[in-house]
């Protein structure tokens, strides 16, 4: 069985928070904004592409105003389905609307020791450890630069992060922090080495790039230049706006949804105009803040509703939806992180997310906590089962069985039960026994059990990494370091 089969939910249960008319209103408001106000593109390459295709460009202000007709033409070429490749093809992820995935999060700067609880600056080994945990979890489908490898040279840090993730996990990889041309070119060389060449990389892209926009209505130079480079190579790009209600976007959910959508749409249009058919995703991590303190409110009700709009807009444009879920503001694993992440993940997938980003961080995406990933893995398993819904058929109605059993029957040992019992979700981490049994077994908390499981995972060597590929990675990173030093 391919790994993706574990992530299949079919025509999932959806909440449908927005109706078709409301989705169209957000779309039309977005078109109004990007044509009348425009978007600031701090990239001359991007402005060249937009101007050549009918946008009105002011070079001094770097504002591009994009007519609705240009938007519609560009979005007509987006691919609706494609595959995210993995080092081991068994872990390839089809994006077809019938599977749901989560990756580890990014990009924190601290790591929490699972034994002592001590919080310190993150290093490359933390990414390796996180990748090993991702590999071991059934419900976490992709690894990422979850924290910064601060013990590596800044010029090649993103390459070291990709190296750590790839050597320790066979799953798809998420890249977030590319800022320079040599990083992009070097990363593509590493990905081509994994895939077996540029042509194979286009068929099975080895990584997805998350490109953060700057709210309100800015597209940074390095992000847009990177998007154009990666799109040409067939690498999926998820544009990732993060407007904050009442700060960098309107305080109303619908208003900030327009800002979020404008930043996604302007980036997607650019990519499609330059490279029609390049894979893009409707991404983002829009959020709120607590107005009485200014504190980040990543999983407030308003933030969850705002992010839910993205799934509806992605469906409207016919592109995969990739957005943030799981960035709890809790400072330690426990009750707060569990209820925040459970609600965030359910709301994301029930409103159309194909992939969420992600799990593994506390304190508003700053502190890596490996044991919290195991709790999230359990939550995602529950959410998947709920979204699969209820099958109603002659077999599942079981009328003949009910008649046979009557008033005194015991269904436990019937063939029908044996045939379907494995369909029932089973807890792996949560406590399901009786109180006395739990107490007599040491009264371990869920966090303690997760810590023990993390230790077990890290004690097992990662899957063998091909020596020739490792040598090629080392050579590419060394060459990038020399190129960076010469700039």
Language-model region placement:
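Helix-rich catalytic cores of soluble enzyme domains
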Residues: 121-350, 354
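N-terminal small/glycine-rich loop or linker at the start of catalytic domains
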Residues: 22-24, 31, 94-116, 316-328
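Glycine-rich, N-terminal phosphate-binding loop and its surrounding beta-alpha-beta segment
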Residues: 45-118
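Non-catalytic terminal accessory/regulatory regions of metabolic enzymes
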Residues: 1, 8-10, 31-32, 37-44, ...
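Catalytic-core signal marking the mid-to-C-terminal active-site face
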Residues: 2-3, 17-28, 37, 42-48, ...
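Flexible, glycine/charged-enriched surface loops at secondary-structure junctions
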Residues: 40-47, 60-61, 141, 201-203, ...
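Short beta-alpha connecting loops at secondary-structure transitions
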Residues: 11-15, 292-298, 326-333, 360-372
């Amino acid at each position: 069985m391919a790994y993706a089969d574990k992530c299949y939910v079919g025509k999932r249960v959806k909440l449908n928070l927005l109706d078709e008319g409301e989705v169209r209103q957000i779309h039309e408001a977005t078109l109004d904004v990007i044509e009348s106000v425009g978007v600031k593109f701090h990239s001359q390459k991007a402005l060249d592409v937009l101007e050549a295709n009918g946008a009105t460009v002011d070079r001094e202000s770097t504002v591009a105003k994009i007519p609705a007709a240009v938007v519609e033409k560009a979005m007509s070429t987006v691919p609706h389905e494609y595959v995210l490749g993995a080092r081991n093809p068994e872990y390839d992820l089809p994006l077809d609307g019938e599977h749901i995935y989560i990756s580890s999060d990014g990009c924190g700067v601290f790591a929490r020791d699972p034994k002592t609880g001590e919080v310190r600056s993150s290093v490359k080994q933390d990414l390796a450890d996180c990748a090993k945990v991702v590999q071991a979890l059934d419900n976490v489908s992709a690894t990422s630069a979850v924290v910064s490898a601060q013990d590596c040279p800044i010029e090649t840090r993103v390459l070291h992060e990709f190296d750590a993730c790839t050597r320790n996990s066979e799953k798809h990889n998420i890249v977030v922090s590319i800022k320079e041309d040599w990083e992009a070119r070097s990363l593509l060389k590493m990905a081509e080495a994994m895939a077996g060449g540029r042509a194979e990389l286009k068929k099975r892209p080895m990584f997805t790039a998350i490109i953060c926009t700057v709210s309100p209505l800015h597209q940074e130079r390095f992000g847009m230049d990177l998007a154009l480079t990666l799109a040409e190579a067939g690498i999926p790009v998820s544009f990732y706006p993060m407007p904050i209600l009442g700060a960098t976007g309107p305080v109303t959910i619908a208003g900030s949804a327009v800002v979020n959508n404008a930043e996604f749409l302007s980036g997607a249009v650019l990519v499609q105009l330059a490279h029609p058919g390049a894979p893009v995703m409707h991404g983002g991590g829009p959020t709120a803040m607590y107005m009485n303190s200014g504190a980040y409110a990543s999983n407030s009700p308003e933030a969850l509703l705002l992010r839910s709009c993205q799934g509806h807009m992605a469906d409207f444009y016919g592109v995969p939806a990739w957005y943030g879920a799981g960035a709890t503001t809790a400072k330690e694993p426990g009750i707060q992180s569990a209820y925040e992440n459970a609600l965030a993940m359910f709301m994301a997938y029930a409103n159309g997310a194909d992939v969420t980003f992600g799990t593994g961080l506390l304190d508003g995406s700053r502190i890596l906590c490996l044991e919290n990933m195991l709790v999230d893995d359990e939550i995602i398993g529950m959410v998947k089962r709920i979204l699969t819904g209820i099958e109603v058929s002659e077999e599942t109605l079981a009328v003949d069985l009910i008649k046979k059993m009557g008033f005194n029957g015991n269904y436990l040992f019937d063939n029908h039960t044996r045939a379907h019992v494995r369909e029932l979700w089973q807890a792996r981490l949560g406590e399901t026994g009786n109180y006395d049994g739990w107490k007599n077994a040491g009264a371990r908390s869920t966090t303690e059990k997760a810590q023990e499981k993390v230790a077990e995972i890290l004690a097992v060597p990662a899957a063998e990494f091909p020596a020739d590929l490792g040598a090629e990675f080392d050579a590419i990173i060394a060459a990038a370091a020399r190129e960076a030093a010469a700039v």
